[in-house]
Amino acid sequence: MVWHKSPLHPILITIALSAGLVAIPASLSRAQNGANAPARSEIKVGWNSFEPPETGAPGRRVGGGTRSICPAEARGLTALVPQTNMGRTMSASPTVILYVPALPTEMTVEFTVTAVSDDNYTPMSQQSFQTVGGSTIALPLPETETSLDVGQLYYWDFSIVCNPKDKSGNIVVGGWIDRIEPTSVLTAELQNASPEKAFEIYSREYIWYDAAASLALLRLAAPDDKTLAKTWQDLLASVGLEDIANAPLATMTSTPNNQSAAP
């Protein structure tokens, strides 16, 4: 299920990628073996070629202003998605990425995933954890609860809970996910591709969630690599989010009753 806004423009990316797929926590150790290889990139704007249908559902990628009791710092909450809030994935359990600004105190945040069909909204999962923010986090969808179907539209949202008794004032951002079925040609190309080539393919095909997660994986493995940092800056600039490109990256770790951001 893909909604086209305009013809695609070419994208050329060459990067040293040391992870095979996009599941960040599972693949991080493999990336650490060679993530420091040189990389060069040329990223062109084209991610907005896909947009969700008019369902009436929200689509905010930046927290923005609020009259709630939320601290002013919370308004910088940002979903790392294209301007249309729409991104594609080939994964049944993709990783979403968002920036959580530094908060004045530890606060509760919530992450939910909803299946959307016409005017029907079916909740699939909800997670909550405590954080003081201050980083860009890579947050995988829970495999045990959330397996995305091809052709089904999904919406995820992430909120900073400012008043547990009245969540209408929460700072909320979110994005759309469209899981696509790759063609046999694309599948074969990825199966035979080196990690470097796989990232190039994701980007060439404008598969946002997989491309962004792959690059985030590299940066997590080599946070001091200046070339990877520049590639990350270019990627975020291509969707108008260059202002948060220098924030440190973190993954998510979880226990049955608690979740937290771990650098």
Where are these regions (language model features)?
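Bacterial N-terminal signal peptides
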Residues: 12-23
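Extended, polar beta-sheet/loop recognition surfaces of beta-rich domains
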Residues: 37-56, 68, 86, 130, ...
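Inward-facing hydrophobic residues that define packing positions of alpha-helical scaffold repeats
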Residues: 214-216
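Preference for solvent-exposed, low-hydrophobicity sequence contexts
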Residues: 218, 223, 229-263
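Extracytoplasmic/surface-exposed domains of secreted proteins
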Residues: 96-98, 136-176
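Solvent-exposed serine/threonine-rich low-complexity stretches and specific carbohydrate-binding patches
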Residues: 122-135
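Contiguous beta-strand segments within globular domains
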Residues: 75, 83-104
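Solvent-exposed loop/turn segments flanking beta-strands in beta-repeat/beta-sandwich domains
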Residues: 102-111, 117
